[in-house]
Amino acid sequence: EDDHDHHHHHHHHHHHHGVGGGGGGGGGGA
């Protein structure tokens, strides 16, 4: 999923380490 997501979705929490604090919310942002 990580590789697939890396190509299509850059909004995932694992990619946006800067918003790691809001990573939980990042999932909601997705």
Curated annotation (Swiss-Prot):
Primary localisation category: secreted
Q: Does the keyword Secreted apply?
A: yes
Entry keywords, A to Z: Metalloenzyme inhibitor, Metalloprotease inhibitor, Protease inhibitor, Secreted
Q: Region (Disordered): which ranges?
A: 1-30
- Skewed-composition ranges (Gly residues): 19-30
Q: Name one GO molecular function term.
A: peptidase inhibitor activity
Gene Ontology, cellular component aspect: extracellular region
Q: In which tissues is it expressed?
A: Expressed by the venom gland.
What highest taxon heads this organism's lineage? Eukaryota
Q: Where in the cell is it found?
A: Secreted
Point to the regions of Basic residues compositional bias.
Answer: 1-18
Sequence similarity:
Belongs to the pHpG family.
Q: What does this protein do?
A: May serve as a metalloproteinase inhibitor during glandular storage. Their inhibition may be instantly disengaged, by dilution or physiochemical change, when venom is injected into tissue of the victim.
Q: What is this protein called?
A: Poly-His-poly-Gly peptide 2
Q: Which organism is it from?
A: Atheris nitschei
